[in-house]
Swiss-Prot record:
Keyword Cell membrane: no
Catalyzed chemical reaction(s): N-succinyl-L-glutamate 5-semialdehyde + NAD(+) + H2O = N-succinyl-L-glutamate + NADH + 2 H(+)
Function field: Catalyzes the NAD-dependent reduction of succinylglutamate semialdehyde into succinylglutamate.
Organism listed in the record: Pseudomonas entomophila (strain L48)
Protein name, as recorded: N-succinylglutamate 5-semialdehyde dehydrogenase
Length: 487
């Protein structure tokens, strides 16, 4: 069994037994054993040994390997999309867009590296001032399950481009996607040890995060795990830690002319990927009164007809499943708890089949709920809050420990400027879905959503550190000596 990729070799695991399941059928997709602490150590050592050679390659040589990787992804795009769909439950049309994002990440990362962490020089008195960047060394990448190809890729590609070597621990829920991705790297000619794959759950993650041989850790996932990592790295300024976590994201709706456009944008913000994007709208702020009532009624009517089904269902569904039966049950429990506290079900989220992680969209009015939990419910559950005036809406939007994404649907530019100025979030959109992102922009948040290490286009910033140099080819005395020195 070839579960892990360490020092250029596919190896069986020596840790706990693992398997991934299709969330709808519960069929076994992948089986193996996780990496124990010894195998994690071997992976870190392999990366350390490979680092000098990889870092000393020219930038163009590293780009060549990355471009070959993009080519391998294209060649196996259909296989990879099927694997993503099978393991996560997301529809094939959406899985295919994820593979496209993986391919495009290479060119975007090269552009970002040249722009943000390239080399610059200029004259300074009798020397040349030069700014260059160096890789950190060996970095760990922890991947999430919701975009098991694209999101780890967003750390791995810029890290390798900068000259780092990587130990990659994917989510234990999506090991097969990680295995296929690493196969593409191997086929692209990446030297042994430059990228190492260690599969596993908590045991593997704890061993990797605590390994003294890593120079940094790049994480995308839940705030709970991210906070634990932040505590673990406290007092270690020698290690770079990049955290991209979740959010309790608000979408504020003003009285717009095009009601259906608002409804469609809300659905794309709240229910795409079965609500499993970190930028999904969790709270919908709607004005009190007749217009708000009509918006909510239209939203409920359209959401009730949203197609939900298996990843390969035809015609294709809009929503697939959530990642697991456990996740589905936790979401239903969260809905029940809110309803028990006084929330009103406008469209109750349901689980049509007890043995499948398929959930229908849920919309609940929590306006009357005292002490609403400031949590990220990672699924198709949208909370509606009615507001009396625009300033109250902004205050409620900011009433969260998180700060990932916020959005406004409004026909007024003045209101958007006011909203943008007062919003506390790393992503602020106007009349666009919260789940949309530009490849040429950073991606990250403030507060409990991250530690100011924005990813995407700004990933280059945490993959290398700046080195400032004053240089001249010959050593010579200055024209004027410092007072008090005689030669």
């Amino acid at each position: 069994m070839t579960t892990h990729y360490i020092a250029g070799q596919w190896l069986a695991g020596q840790g706990e037994a693992l398997q991934s399941l299709n969330p709808v059928t519960q069929a076994v997709v992948w089986t193996g054993q996780g990496a124990d602490a010894g195998q994690v150590e071997a992976a870190v050592q392999a990366a350390r040994q490979a680092f000098p050679g990889w870092a000393s390659l020219s930038l163009e040589a590293r780009i060549g390997v990355l471009e070959a990787f993009a080519g391998k992804l294209k060649a196996r795009a259909e296989e990879l999309a099927h694997c993503i769909g099978e393991e996560t439950g997301k529809p094939l049309w959406e899985s295919a867009t994820e593979v496209t994002s993986m391919v495009n990440k290479v060119a975007i990362s090269v552009q970002s590296y040249r722009e943000r962490t390239g080399e610059k020089s200029g004259p300074l008195a009798d020397a040349t001032a030069v700014l260059r960047h160096k890789p950190h060394g060996v970095v760990a990448v922890f991947g999430p399950y919701n975009f098991p190809g694209h999101l780890p890729n967003g750390h791995i590609v810029p890290a390798l481009l900068a000259g780092n070597c990587v130990v990659f621990k994917p989510s234990e829920l999506t090991p097969k996607v990680a295995e296929l991705t690493v196969q593409c790297w191997v086929e692209a000619g990446l030297p042994a040890g430059v990228l190492n794959l260690v599969q596993g759950a908590r045991e593997t993650g704890v061993a990797l995060a605590a390994n003294p041989g890593i120079d940094g850790l790049f994480f995308t996932g839940s705030s709970r795990t991210g906070n634990l990592l932040h505590q673990q790295f406290a007092g270690r300024p020698d290690k770079i830690l990049a955290l991209e976590m979740g959010g309790n994201n608000p979408l504020v709706v003003d009285e717009v002319k095009d009601l259906d456009a608002a409804v469609y944008t809300i659905i794309q913000s709240a229910f795409i990927s079965a609500g499993q994007r970190c930028t999904c709208a969790r709270r919908l702020l709607v004005p009190q009164g007749a217009w708000g009532d009509s918006l909510i009624q239209r939203l409920v009517d359209v959401s009730r007809s949203i197609s939900v089904g298996a990843f390969d269902q035809q015609p294709a569904p809009f929503m697939g499943s959530v990642i697991s039966l456990q996740a589905a049950r936790a979401l239903l429990a969260a809905q029940a708890e809110l309803l028990g506290k006084g929330a009103v079900a406008l469209l109750e989220m349901t689980q049509p089949q007890a043995d499948a992680a398929l959930l229908t969209p849920g919309i609940i009015d929590v306006t009357a709920v005292a002490g609403r939990p400031d949590e990220e419910f990672f699924g198709p559950l949208l909370q509606v809050i009615r507001y009396a005036d625009f300033d109250a809406a902004i205050e409620e939007a900011n009433n969260t420990q998180y700060g990932l994404a916020a959005g406004l649907l409004s026909d007024s530019n003045a209101r958007y400027q006011h909203f943008w100025l007062r919003s506390r979030a790393g992503i602020v959109n106007w009349n666009k879905q919260l789940t949309g992102a530009a490849s040429s922009a950073p991606f990250g948040g403030v507060g409990a959503s991250g530690n100011h290490r924005a990813s995407a286009y700004y990933a280059a910033d945490y993959c290398a550190y700046p080195v400032a140099s004053l240089e001249t080819a010959s050593l010579a005395l200055p024209a004027t000596l410092t007072p008090g020195v005689t030669l």
